[in-house]
UniProtKB/Swiss-Prot annotation, chain B:
The chain crosses the membrane at residues 15-37. The modification Phosphoserine is found at S66. It comes from the Eukaryota. This is Cytochrome c oxidase subunit NDUFA4. InterPro entries: B12D. Keywords: Acetylation, Electron transport, Membrane, Mitochondrion, Mitochondrion inner membrane, Phosphoprotein, Respiratory chain, Transmembrane, Transmembrane helix, Transport. GO terms for cellular component: mitochondrial inner membrane; respiratory chain complex IV. Residues 38-81 are mitochondrial intermembrane. The modification N6-acetyllysine is found at K10. It is found in: Mitochondrion inner membrane. The gene is NDUFA4. Component of the cytochrome c oxidase (complex IV, CIV), a multisubunit enzyme composed of 14 subunits. The complex is composed of a catalytic core of 3 subunits MT-CO1, MT-CO2 and MT-CO3, encoded in the mitochondrial DNA, and 11 supernumerary subunits COX4I, COX5A, COX5B, COX6A, COX6B, COX6C, COX7A, COX7B, COX7C, COX8 and NDUFA4, which are encoded in the nuclear genome. Component of the cytochrome c oxidase, the last enzyme in the mitochondrial electron transport chain which drives oxidative phosphorylation. The respiratory chain contains 3 multisubunit complexes succinate dehydrogenase (complex II, CII), ubiquinol-cytochrome c oxidoreductase (cytochrome b-c1 complex, complex III, CIII) and cytochrome c oxidase (complex IV, CIV), that cooperate to transfer electrons derived from NADH and succinate to molecular oxygen, creating an electrochemical gradient over the inner membrane that drives transmembrane transport and the ATP synthase. It is a single-pass membrane protein.
Amino acid sequence: LTNTSISDAQEMETIWTILPAIILILIALPSLRILYLTDEINDPSFTIKSIGHQWYWTYEYTDYGGLIFNSYMLPPLFLEPGDLRLLDVDNRVVLPVEAPVRMMITSQDVLHSWTVPSLGLKTDAIPGRLNQTTFTATRPGVYYGQCSEICGANHSFMPIVLELIP
Amino acid sequence: MLRQILSQAKKHPSLIPLFVFIGTGASGATLYLLRLALFNPDVCWDRNNPEPWNKLGPNDQYKFYSVNVDYSKLKKERPDF
């Protein structure tokens, strides 16, 4: 009563093996192409370095002159009405819209992760390594993110704020 | 061994496409893994040369497939040191 020797409708079996396989290959190849396209260098207008520390970020704009500043979370006592607790910082990263930007991200001490979810960005900041991410923001506004790799006592208190100006 | 495989394949011909696709997928995955292990600049096998990633060339392509960018034709924008 076992089915080890039952063999029926072999043509159908062949067709419904080959046809889904071909369909899946036709889905996979353009998908892989798109995946590699997201990695392309899009000829950025400028480059910003983002260095993670415990527990703040340092941003360096060194393409045209040297602007280097730290970005600390605003402590609750310093918040104005309307500010976002745990999200607002003292110095925001100011960028123009419609300009391809290259972010070079690293860390000075432990692992951090530079994230801006509304722009689809998350890149780990690894000490001793330089990671790169590129993006082009199309809408002006303020974009928030939080450090996404556990880095110690104040890991939840080192947010990232991007201010995109038209 | 090969003859045994061929005779069994003739007995169940509808299974041949199955083995072809599964075999292609498995060998593709293995080969890509080997490519990553041997050619990825992040990987280091030689204890005597611990940082091969510091010797990357600016015109080499390390990606598996590059859609628009031709790495051998990139022009050099940075100064010589």
